Amino acid sequence: MSTIRGTLSELSRAADAFAHEVDEAGYGDYTFLPDNSPFDLSFLTSKGLEARGSLIAAAEKILRLAKGPQGCLASFADTKGIEMGTIQALTQLEVPDKVPLQGSITYEELAGVIRVAPELLQRLVRLAALAGFLIEDESGAVRHTAMSAVFLRDTAAGDTARFLFDVDMRAYSFFADSLRLDPSGQNIGDGPTALAFQHDSDDQGNRPTIWDILERNPIQRARFHSTMQALGSFPSHLLKHILVAHDWHSIGSLVDVGGSLGHASLVIAENFPEIRITVQDLPDVVERGRSSLPTVPHAERVSFQAHDLFQEQAIIADAYFLRQILHDWPDGDAERIVRCLIPAMRPGAKLLIMDIVVPEPGAISPYMEKYLRTYDVSMFSMFSAKERTVQQLRDLVERCSARLQFQGISCPPGSATSLLSWVYSAE
């Protein structure tokens, strides 16, 4: 493992490479204030993304070494939890929505709107400010940082944060309870999210799953699909990665199964004019996607259809695309989803699965490995599911039909997700 000085050298090299790309993008005075900060880092090249990952990993190492073993452990149990709870509370009280994007608001004005004592509100904001969320101006009034301004600058990104604070975070303290009830981690009714929301159990005592929560709460359901949309602006999940992950020129018709609002399909259609795409999802989701279709020529080749993942596929197409779908389901349900596609598949049809692929320990950069493993555990937390290895995905698909022949895997540089492809062979 690196020493402090060795890690500092790593940090310096990565910071120089990262800063160079930030400068090239026109953000040389980047300080995390709204007026001089990029909204996202989608301008980074693959080298820039690599430098960013190395910079974050080195900075985290330095923090651990500087805190020491005892202090580092205490920060997980105390400091980080308090910071998260503070920003969660400010978000749920809609504080970021009440602070103007330009200018500031006094504590007295803000407290009057959200109905919290000014002195307590000030304490919360001042802690959040040290984490980069909100800040005080010279007069002591509250203004935005680039992070808190996200709620006003992008609805989908703001909805993502709200969904994670309202739903995801509640489950984190129920991991051990869930594992005691279900050591396999595959029974969603005993999962962390179900335990976190067990106060909403039905008359038979069945705890609500994440799917029950989304069905009963249209606000959270809309935020969930906004999260899928916003994910496309995260550096490791940029929609542009899809374009180089497969030879889309070889496909004339595509079914985007569970394609949410169609954000991925629209990008494919824009760049490959020969493809016609059907986006399938639940009725209210496809209605929202249909109503928000942009008025551009390529959108005419994208249509929406209500469809249940667990019902037999009726559309005959060249390819079926499952993008970040199977990781939401334990193995048995994931197999059912794949099996439902097979009746519509003809010889030569492709099955395309784009998901995080879990690597062997140490096989990729520390930053990306931590990112992927965090996603893996979050799938357990919310869905009692998981991210899978290449072999686990192959085994899952090939259990469904021996006629599905594995073609290969592609992971675009800087992408957190890989695209695996199968071809349906003749008997």
Curated annotation (Swiss-Prot):
It holds the Pfam family Methyltransf_2. SUPFAM superfamilies: S-adenosyl-L-methionine-dependent methyltransferases, Winged helix' DNA-binding domain. O-methyltransferase; part of the gene cluster that mediates the biosynthesis of the alkaloid (-)-FR901483, a potent immunosuppressant that shows efficacy in animal models and a probable inhibitor of purine nucleotide biosynthesis by targeting phosphoribosylpyrophosphate amidotransferase (PPAT). Within the pathway, FrzF methylates the phenolic oxygen at position C4. The biosynthesis of (-)-FR901483 starts with the condensation of two L-tyrosines to yield (S,S)-dityrosyl-piperazine. The lineage of its organism: Eukaryota, Fungi, Dikarya, Ascomycota, Pezizomycotina. Keywords: Methyltransferase, S-adenosyl-L-methionine, Transferase. It comes from Cladobotryum sp. It catalyses: (1S,4S)-4-[(4-hydroxyphenyl)methyl]-2,5-diazaspiro[bicyclo[3.2.1]octane-6,1'-cyclohexan]-4'-one + S-adenosyl-L-methionine = (1S,4S)-4-[(4-methoxyphenyl)methyl]-2,5-diazaspiro[bicyclo[3.2.1]octane-6,1'-cyclohexan]-4'-one + S-adenosyl-L-homocysteine + H(+); (1S,4S)-4-[(4-hydroxyphenyl)methyl]-2-methyl-2,5-diazaspiro[bicyclo[3.2.1]octane-6,1'-cyclohexan]-4'-one + S-adenosyl-L-methionine = (1S,4S)-4-[(4-methoxyphenyl)methyl]-2-methyl-2,5-diazaspiro[bicyclo[3.2.1]octane-6,1'-cyclohexan]-4'-one + S-adenosyl-L-homocysteine + H(+). This is O-methyltransferase FrzF. Belongs to the class I-like SAM-binding methyltransferase superfamily. Cation-independent O-methyltransferase family. Homodimer. The gene is FrzF.
